[in-house]
Amino acid sequence: MDQFQHISVVDAQEKLQQQDLNAVLVDIRDPQSFIRGHVENAFHLTNDTIVELMNEVDFEQPVLVMCYHGHSSQGAAQYLVNQGYEEVYSVDGGFEGWHKAGLPVEK
């Protein structure tokens, strides 16, 4: 895949729940927002944690990127594609869309 794909919050949740896919959600919001609430098991991706992500997540695993509203995640998703990740999605609507859809959040 040379490009990331877009995914809705509902489809993102479904993909994360499929155990056989071993999908990973990365949240690129600021630390304070992440602490206030995030998707369960989300990886907080920052400039300081990118190496950790690349060491822990195989390039074949689906990676879903979430930001506030679904805009900044597109740049981060393309960056991950450029690093070699094969199946990368930008979550349309971001955390706001996830929260408005009533999907589960942990604090």
Curated annotation (Swiss-Prot):
Matching SMART domains? RHOD
- Catalyzed reaction equations: thiosulfate + hydrogen cyanide = thiocyanate + sulfite + 2 H(+); thiosulfate + [thioredoxin]-dithiol = [thioredoxin]-disulfide + hydrogen sulfide + sulfite + 2 H(+)
Task: Give the function comment from the record.
Answer: Transferase that catalyzes the transfer of sulfur from thiosulfate to thiophilic acceptors such as cyanide or dithiols. May function in a CysM-independent thiosulfate assimilation pathway by catalyzing the conversion of thiosulfate to sulfite, which can then be used for L-cysteine biosynthesis.
The record's section on InterPro entries has: GlpE_sulfurtransferase, Rhodanese-like_dom, Rhodanese-like_dom_sf, Thiosulf_sulfurTrfase
| SUPFAM superfamilies assigned to the protein according to its UniProt record, in alphabetical order | Rhodanese/Cell cycle control phosphatase (SSF52821)
Which stretches make up the Rhodanese domain?
19-107
Task: Output one GO MF annotation.
Answer: thiosulfate-cyanide sulfurtransferase activity
Q: Which UniProt keywords apply?
A: Cytoplasm, Transferase
| Annotated compartments | Cytoplasm
Catalytic activity, EC: 2.8.1.1
Q: Which domain of life is it from?
A: Bacteria
In the record, biological process GO terms are: glycerol metabolic process
Q: Entry's NCBIfam families? A: PRK00162.1
| Pfam families, sorted | Rhodanese
Cystine links in this protein are none
Which principal EC class is assigned to this enzyme? transferase
User: May I ask which residue range the UniProt record assigns to the signal sequence?
Assistant: none
Record family assignment: Belongs to the GlpE family.
Q: What is this protein called?
A: Thiosulfate sulfurtransferase GlpE
* Primary location: cytoplasm
What are the record's GO terms for cellular component?
A: cytoplasm
- Give the annotated active site: C67 (cysteine persulfide intermediate)
Species of origin reads Aliivibrio fischeri (strain ATCC 700601 / ES114)
